[in-house]
């Protein structure tokens, strides 16, 4: 994985096996998300006492926070099997019907990116979630017939990074909805120490703190940075991940103290140096950094906005005062602070000018 996507919250095919090796297996091993963890524990324990599958579960939140891990944990806590698929992989209702009819009693069906499931398949899923039955249409035209098929009672765990794209009928069929939040630096340090033990990586407390501060509040990024720092420590140091080793390694990979990579800094630098801090339109900003507008909007902006370095305004993107200082630039007098004239109220009435 290159430095440009080292801090991406999305997982690549090449790192799935490595990521799985440090994934928590049980709810007690899952770090942080105390509210969600407690609620989920009540749901699962209640289902086990009754001897019936729990309500269908919807997990929402940014990528890399543990939605897939929680889906596997649900199956482990219930002592059942899990079937894993994704919304884009289910193109036809027949694909989904084949999966549903192959489930055993009490099994967990995990659909990642459930908001991207095809509409015909989604409509088939409604009856399966509510009545544990699917109607498979055989034939076409006036001669088509619907054959009802029973489905074993199961639990659907859906994961989405964009809950707003779920249709109302789909959202309403989930009996338990949980939103995962970004991790605190302290929680990420705990997670890094656990991952280091599993991977056999010697790490100091200040080394874990240094990595956690650059991980954007995301466990997947924290574990990825740990593996890259481990490589540096083994090749160019004594094998121990210390603060100094982590700083040197992440400098090589162009990840700065705030977790910004090359593209993030390019966006801020263009805003400040080329457009005097903005406002500037998204398309113009993308051209300035040599990227597609959707790359800037979907890859860079979410973290820059959350970090308080960039603001989206009706007139365009604006670099905040924190962005200027992070780049080591001094904003012109009056750019920020009490000397800035207040924004005009759209509905204010000004006296007529002579």
UniProtKB/Swiss-Prot annotation:
SUPFAM superfamilies: P-loop containing nucleoside triphosphate hydrolases, Winged helix' DNA-binding domain. Residues 257-354 are annotated as: Head domain (RuvB-H). InterPro entries: AAA+_ATPase, AAA_lid_4, DNA_helicase_Holl-junc_RuvB, P-loop_NTPase, RuvB-like_N, RuvB_C, WH-like_DNA-bd_sf, WH_DNA-bd_sf. Mg(2+) binds at residue 68. Keywords: ATP-binding, Cytoplasm, DNA damage, DNA recombination, DNA repair, DNA-binding, Hydrolase, Nucleotide-binding. The keyword DNA-binding applies. Residues 184-254 are annotated as: Small ATPAse domain (RuvB-S). DNA binds at residues 312, 317. Its main location: cytoplasm. Coiled coil: none annotated. One of its GO terms (cellular component) is cytoplasm. SMART domains: AAA. Residues 1-183 are annotated as: Large ATPase domain (RuvB-L). It is found in: Cytoplasm. Pfam families: AAA_lid_4, RuvB_C, RuvB_N. It comes from the Bacteria. Homohexamer. Forms an RuvA(8)-RuvB(12)-Holliday junction (HJ) complex. HJ DNA is sandwiched between 2 RuvA tetramers; dsDNA enters through RuvA and exits via RuvB. An RuvB hexamer assembles on each DNA strand where it exits the tetramer. Each RuvB hexamer is contacted by two RuvA subunits (via domain III) on 2 adjacent RuvB subunits; this complex drives branch migration. In the full resolvosome a probable DNA-RuvA(4)-RuvB(12)-RuvC(2) complex forms which resolves the HJ. Has 3 domains, the large (RuvB-L) and small ATPase (RuvB-S) domains and the C-terminal head (RuvB-H) domain. The head domain binds DNA, while the ATPase domains jointly bind ATP, ADP or are empty depending on the state of the subunit in the translocation cycle. During a single DNA translocation step the structure of each domain remains the same, but their relative positions change. HAMAP family: DNA_HJ_migration_RuvB. This is Holliday junction branch migration complex subunit RuvB. It comes from Salinispora tropica (strain ATCC BAA-916 / DSM 44818 / JCM 13857 / NBRC 105044 / CNB-440). The lineage of its organism: Bacteria, Bacillati, Actinomycetota, Actinomycetes, Micromonosporales.
């Amino acid at each position: 994985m290159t430095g440009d996507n080292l801090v991406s919250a999305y997982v690549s095919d090449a790192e799935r096996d490595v990521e799985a090796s440090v994934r928590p297996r049980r709810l007690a091993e899952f770090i942080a998300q105390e509210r969600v963890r407690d609620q989920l524990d009540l749901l699962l324990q209640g289902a086990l006492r009754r001897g019936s599958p729990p309500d269908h579960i919807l997990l929402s939140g940014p990528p890399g926070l543990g939605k897939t891990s929680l889906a596997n944990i649900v199956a482990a806590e219930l002592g059942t099997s899990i079937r894993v698929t994704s919304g884009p992989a289910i193109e036809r209702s027949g694909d989904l019907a084949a999966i549903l009819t192959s489930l055993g009693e009490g099994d967990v069906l995990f659909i990642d990116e459930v908001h991207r499931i095809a509409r015909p398949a989604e409509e088939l899923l409604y009856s399966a979630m509510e009545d544990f039955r699917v109607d498979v249409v055989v034939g076409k035209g006036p001669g088509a017939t619907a054959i009802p098929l029973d489905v074993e009672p199961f639990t659907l765990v859906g994961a989405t990074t964009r809950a707003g794209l779920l249709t109302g009928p789909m959202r309403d069929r989930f009996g338990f909805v949980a939103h995962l939040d970004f991790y605190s630096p302290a929680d990420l340090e705990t997670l890094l120490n656990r991952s280091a033990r599993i991977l056999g990586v010697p790490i100091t407390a200040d080394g874990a703190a240094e990595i956690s501060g650059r991980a954007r509040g995301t466990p997947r990024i924290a574990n990825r940075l740990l593996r890259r720092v481990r490589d540096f420590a083994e090749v160019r140091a004594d094998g121990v991940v210390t603060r100094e080793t982590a700083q040197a390694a992440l400098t090589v990979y162009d990840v700065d103290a705030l977790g910004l990579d090359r593209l993030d800094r390019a966006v801020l630098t263009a805003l400040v140096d080329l457009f005097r801090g903005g406002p500037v339109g998204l398309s113009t900003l993308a051209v300035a950094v040599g990227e597609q507008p959707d790359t800037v909007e979907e890859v860079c902006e979410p973290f820059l906005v959350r970090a308080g370095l960039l603001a989206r305004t009706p007139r365009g993107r604006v670099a905040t005062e924190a962005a200027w200082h992070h780049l080591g630039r001094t904003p012109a007098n009056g750019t920020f602070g009490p000397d800035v004239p207040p924004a005009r109220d759209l509905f204010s009435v000004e006296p007529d000018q002579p």
